[in-house]
Amino acid sequence: MRSGQSSRTEPASLPWHPSGLVAGVDEAGRGPLAGPVMAAAVMLDERQPIMGLADSKKLTPARRASLFDEIRAKALCYSIAQASVQEIDALNILQATLLAMRRAVQGLRLRPALVLVDGNRLPRLDIPAQAIVKGDALQPAISAASILAKVQRDHWCVQVHAEFPQYGFAGHKGYGTAMHLAALRAHGACIHHRRSFAPVARSLPGACR
């Protein structure tokens, strides 16, 4: 696999690759104590521009939700994939994230000529790829991918909250807030918690606290 890394890329410099289409890839959910890590791959259509694309973390939930629908309606194609809690615990969070990214690219209906990935690590692909630090703020396709991954994971948290309301997943989205840590101490871990993460491991039966 040919690959490269860049810490700076002009936002409009790579909408199309000379030999074909470009896909942007990003993830959501590396830091939380529970749930899968999500990844999305997006190939934008320059004939249908989407205004306001940005790093998903800098957008309000309402704006993310609006863009989530617009991206899915206007993109040439997109794919959302995940790596499970079991895979995170077996592989570690970095390798599970790269696995989810690879699955997202493999799920695209069209084959890109170049894959732009947010961050400084690349998943194993059979397509030329470039890692771009802060790519979610620099490349519209990566911004779109970050929004799809974030909103999809937030949806998962809301659904799981109905099953396990005592943990408050709908509010903290799985992150290690004071409320979440208190719930872990009170109730122990549920099936969706990442047992390889230290705060969860400390809540398991027999763990030293």
UniProtKB/Swiss-Prot annotation:
It comes from Verminephrobacter eiseniae (strain EF01-2). One of its GO terms (molecular function) is RNA binding. It holds the Pfam family RNase_HII. It is found in: Cytoplasm. A divalent metal cation binds at D26, E27, D118. This is Ribonuclease HII. Its cofactor is Mn(2+); Mg(2+). It is an enzyme of class 3 (hydrolase). NCBIfam families: PRK00015.1-3, PRK00015.1-4. InterPro entries: RNase_HII (IPR022898), RNase_HII/HIII (IPR001352), RNase_HII/HIII_dom (IPR024567), RNaseH-like_sf (IPR012337), RNaseH_sf (IPR036397).
